[in-house]
Amino acid sequence: MQLDSIDTALQALKKGESIIVVDDENRENEGDLVAVTEWMNDNTVNFMATYGKGLICAPISNAIAEKLDLNPMVTHNSDVYGTQFTVSVDHIQTTTGISADERTMTARALIDEQATGSDFNKPGHLFPLIAQDNGVLSRRGHTEASVDLAKLTGAKPAALICEIMDEDGTMAKGASLEAFKETHGLVMISIEDLEKYRKSSISKLDAKAKVKMPTEYGNFDMYGFTTDNSEEDIVVIANGDINKTENVRIHSACLTGDIFHSQRCDCGEQLAASMKYIAEHGGMILYLPQEGRGIGLINKLKAYELIEQGYDTVSANIALGFEEDLRDYQNAAQILKYFGVDSVNLLSNNPKKFESLESYGIHIAKRIELIVPTNAYNQDYMDTKKEKMGHLI
């Protein structure tokens, strides 16, 4: 099968064109038409319905789904591939909701920054799908691929997809997809190539310094790294001989907690507990510049303002226009590989860290729980991390 490059696909999507995305022959082994919602043209839905002939769905990020109160279609998902359908929707200004124009209206409303859940009738004729946060590095499906492509074009994380069917009603595969591509002059890529593209875009890492660092917890070696995807530096402290399997804490910088000992969070206490553990048992702490789960210090303070008005730590980030957690651990995985570490005993309560590291080739040999005392100021925060973010506390 003749495939195009990911860069060619991104250029086509930015022009408002649909492309073909094929998945693994050992998975669904299908081709989907994909368009980015923000860039799509007025004929996109009609083209998909006329020539694709499959179910037109609208992959979106989890943040959009939460913002619009789009709940799962079913309580217990038994789909063999775990596709995360939400309840179907029509925009409230549609009539029947099924026409190409009205499904286009509904799709565009999903990415309207002013839209709320009350702007949609449920059920409807457009089927949102929730993509996993780390895209094809977590799940190699068309849902994640289309949202990854949207992000890579600089658009909001939303797309339209539609399976391509043959004239006889069976799913188009192989030669049929190639013929479809030629007939309609479309770009065609694979999810496998998209996954490789994302992994190959990992930043350049440079080790700049190494010093001895005595602390109240013990003596450490401190390393300084720079990357080409951040203006902020990364610090690593290590104790003992570094082995292929290592005790590791990946800690996101928290000025308020780590430096000013804020009681709004548990970050400072987790850092202290990690340093004590590494001082006693050996290992490494990677200190990443990911303030406020990636939204930055000022936005974190704005989130605190919303929390004082009754929001929780997740809904506050979403209200500011962010996903609940923007962090990615590519740089952490690179640093571990720099030290020859490919397997870790991870000091963490956050399952997303496990998933992200494993997607970058770091094996999680064991989880070391990191439980610290709560207080009257951070109890709601801790409850939200457990109930909404799945933290193991």
Curated annotation (Swiss-Prot):
The record marks 125, 163 as: Essential for DHBP synthase activity. D-ribulose 5-phosphate binds at residues 27-28, 32, 139-143, 163. InterPro entries: DHBP_synth_RibB-like_a/b_dom (IPR017945), DHBP_synthase_RibB (IPR000422), GTP_cyclohydro_II (IPR032677), RibA (IPR000926), RibA-like_sf (IPR036144), Riboflavin_synth_RibBA (IPR016299). It holds the Pfam family GTP_cyclohydro2. Its EC number is 4.1.99.12, 3.5.4.25. Keywords: GTP-binding, Hydrolase, Lyase, Magnesium, Manganese, Metal-binding, Multifunctional enzyme, Nucleotide-binding, Riboflavin biosynthesis, Zinc. One of its GO terms (molecular function) is manganese ion binding. This is Riboflavin biosynthesis protein RibBA. It comes from Staphylococcus saprophyticus subsp. saprophyticus (strain ATCC 15305 / DSM 20229 / NCIMB 8711 / NCTC 7292 / S-41).
